[in-house]
Amino acid sequence: MTRKIFESDLEELHSELLRMGSMAEKQIYDCMEALEKQDENMAEVIIKKDDIIDDMQKEIENKVIRLIAMQQPIVAEDLRNIFTTVKIVTDLERLGDHAVDIAKAIKRLNGEKHHDIVKEIWNMGNKVKSMIKDSLDAYVERNLDKAYEVCKRDDDVDSLYKRIFNELLNIMSEDKSKVNQLTQFLFVCKYLERIGDRTTNVCESTIYLITGKQVDLND
């Protein structure tokens, strides 16, 4: 394989990663819309679409294997590029799984009228959505500052999760009639927090791609 063909295949790999990222991002957007509208049909569509994300991951990983097999020797920078792609794709697939978890929780709400605390969950969802978008932008732009900035925002998501979690437990202790709804809200918040962690992982991979240094910013 010539260098020119290798670089073209590598660029196509990145394009497929971004297509996968866009779909995973939309899954989260749709989750929050389904929660707001109490739309069980939309939640079901989210669940079914996860198979597409899984297939995209497998296809990208297969292309990575073929690329490594056909391009020898591989220089360190190229290997880092490929390794980063695999790591990010893995986190995007997990992100899609968490979208499914949220969609399933939405279906279990059974159309109950929302408690006012749902507004706090929408706020948390908006923060996570912006993190996903900006993490992918940081990867595309090779923007080190943006990658670190997105990681810092995960601390806000973690703090919000803890506060909402405690509020939900307090409300449950006072109003037993809302236990099912509030329990599902707990699940939604838990998975939003995990999505924030996955997004931080994407930024860590971008930092590694740019600097060659592995960092752990998910503490």
UniProtKB/Swiss-Prot annotation:
GO terms for biological process: intracellular phosphate ion homeostasis; negative regulation of phosphate metabolic process; negative regulation of phosphate transmembrane transport; phosphate ion transport; regulation of phosphate metabolic process. InterPro entries: P_transport_PhoU (IPR028366), PhoU-like_sf (IPR038078), PhoU_dom (IPR026022). The keyword Cytoplasm applies. Induction: By phosphate limitation. Its main location: cytoplasm. Keywords: Cytoplasm, Phosphate transport, Transport. It holds the Pfam family PhoU. It comes from the Bacteria. It is found in: Cytoplasm. GO terms for molecular function: protein homodimerization activity. GO terms for cellular component: cytoplasm. Gene3D superfamilies: Phosphate transport system protein phou homolog 2, domain 2. Homodimer. Plays a role in the regulation of phosphate uptake. Encoded together with proteins of the phosphate-specific transport (Pst) system in the polycistronic pstSCAB-phoU operon. NCBIfam families: phoU_full. Belongs to the PhoU family. This is Phosphate-specific transport system accessory protein PhoU homolog. It comes from Clostridium acetobutylicum (strain ATCC 824 / DSM 792 / JCM 1419 / IAM 19013 / LMG 5710 / NBRC 13948 / NRRL B-527 / VKM B-1787 / 2291 / W).
